[in-house]
Structures are given as C-alpha cells and as structure tokens.
Amino acid sequence: MSSELSPIDKAKFVCAKRAAQLVESGMRVGLGTGSTAAWLVRCLGQRVRNEGLQITGVPTSTRTAELAREVGIDIITLDAAKRLDLTIDGADEFDGAFNLIKGGGGALLHEKVVAASSDRMVVIADVGKEVETLGAFPLPIEVIPFGLQTTHALVDETLVSMDVLGRDSSLRMDGDKPFVTDEGNHIIDLHLKRIGDARQLALTLNQVPGVVENGLFIDICDTVVLGFGDGKVEVRDINDGTIASERMIFAETDNLFSDLSD
C-alpha cells in the first residue's frame, strides 16, 4: 500500500500517526489546520473507532471541525475547554529553535490562540519544512477588512526597517476575491526570503494598526514530530534536548487516508 503514496504523503502520514500516539483518553486536544493536520485528525479518528480512545477536540478552523465530526471525534469550543492538554498542528517552516511560520491554510489566528492555551504544542511536519532560517515560505498576517489598503501600506512601511531579505507583499486571494478567514478577516502574505530576527519582527508587526496577528510562532512549540518519505520518524523535544527515531510500519488499512490532498 505504501507505494500508492508519494514520498511527501508518506512523510505526512507517518509523523501524524506517530503524533496521534501521544494522545491519551481523557485529553482535551487542539486540532490544527492544513494537509498534515488533516492526516492527524484521521489518525485520531481511527484510534477512536478501533481503540475506544475518548478525547475532546478543539478545532482551529471550520474545515478541521467538519473533518473531526466526520471521523467521530467529539469537539467543543476553546471557551468550553478552557485549558488544553495538548495541541497538534502542522507548520509551513520551522527552525532549529522550534520557531515556526504558520498560516498557509489561513487559520493562523485560531491556531495561535489554541496553541497558547495548551500545556504542550506538538508540531507535525515532513522533513522539507525544516530550515536553517525562517522566511523562504511567505509569512502571513491577518488583518481586518476596514482600511485594508491603509493597513497594507503601513505594513510595507514597517518592513523597510526590519532585518529581512525581501519586502514584497500580496493580498491573499480566493479566486477573484480576497481570501476571508473564519473571523471574517483577510490575509496579507509577506515574501521576506529570510527573516533575521523573527522575535522582533513578530512584535513589530502586531503593533501595526489593523494587524490582528502574524504567522510567527515564537517560544510556543515544545516538540516536533518529523516525517521522512521512507517511513522514518524523528521525535525532537526542545525541553529535554532529546531526539528519538523509529520507523513506522504501513498496513493495508492505511489506504483509508489516501483521499487526503494538499
């Protein structure tokens, strides 16, 4: 069955399957958004059905909520959950200090609030998401609709004084209309190429009037579960500095995940 999956899909699947093993009955779990997080939700759903795993999920988007319901995971709001034991989510990039760029799926605001409300954040990613320096992937920022062009101009002005290699920006579109987040906001993607000081950039962007949140996740991620195309998985923990490797086994029943796409 594994030959039916591309190497990148194998990597996404194995890291999601390994991360799903971190979840225990009784936990309140933040469920991320994106293609890798979708594999995670499916893996958890399989454990709910096959093992009787009893968890409560807090989804970070309407898309994730729909998928969680589909696979049999009970979901509640973050306000109802109050505090989460664990959040598992993907990342568009991560560096050696576990700083992240997230928001390629447009859910960065909910993702950051949910992650900040968790005792532990686990990032699942294929090996291609690991970088020496953040910035090759466009950095998304969520902005309110009011004064959109003004906010965009203020962001561009702010980038002039930032330690970045590129300063292009673009409004994210959905067909011929601006993309709309679950909160009714828009996304501006910053094409920075290289971010010299991610912490300073994150703080500065959030001071721009009209900017709600940015896709830099600093000092939030505790563990990275990294998947490889050959089935290898690495679990890296920043708190104790450990790296554990293993190889996940593909079973014939794993083809129930093959309908997921990027």
Swiss-Prot record:
Alphabetical list of SUPFAM superfamilies matching this protein: D-ribose-5-phosphate isomerase (RpiA), lid domain, NagB/RpiA/CoA transferase-like
Single GO cellular component term: cytosol
GO BP annotation list: D-ribose metabolic process; pentose-phosphate shunt, non-oxidative branch
Pfam families: Rib_5-P_isom_A
Record's keyword terms, sorted: Isomerase
EC code(s) of this entry: 5.3.1.6
Pathway entry: Carbohydrate degradation; pentose phosphate pathway; D-ribose 5-phosphate from D-ribulose 5-phosphate (non-oxidative stage): step 1/1
Annotated active site: E111 (proton acceptor)
Transmembrane segments: none
InterPro entries registered for this protein in UniProt: NagB/RpiA_transferase-like, Ribose5P_isomerase_typA_subgr, Ribose5P_isomerase_type_A
Binding site for substrate: T33, G34, S35, T36, D89, G90, A91, D92, K102, G103, G104, G105, K129
Domain of life: Bacteria
MF-aspect GO terms: ribose-5-phosphate isomerase activity
Reaction it catalyzes: aldehydo-D-ribose 5-phosphate = D-ribulose 5-phosphate
Function: Catalyzes the reversible conversion of ribose-5-phosphate to ribulose 5-phosphate.
Family, per entry: Belongs to the ribose 5-phosphate isomerase family.
Known partners and oligomeric status: Homodimer.
Protein name, entry field: Ribose-5-phosphate isomerase A
Source organism: Roseobacter denitrificans (strain ATCC 33942 / OCh 114) (Erythrobacter sp. (strain OCh 114))
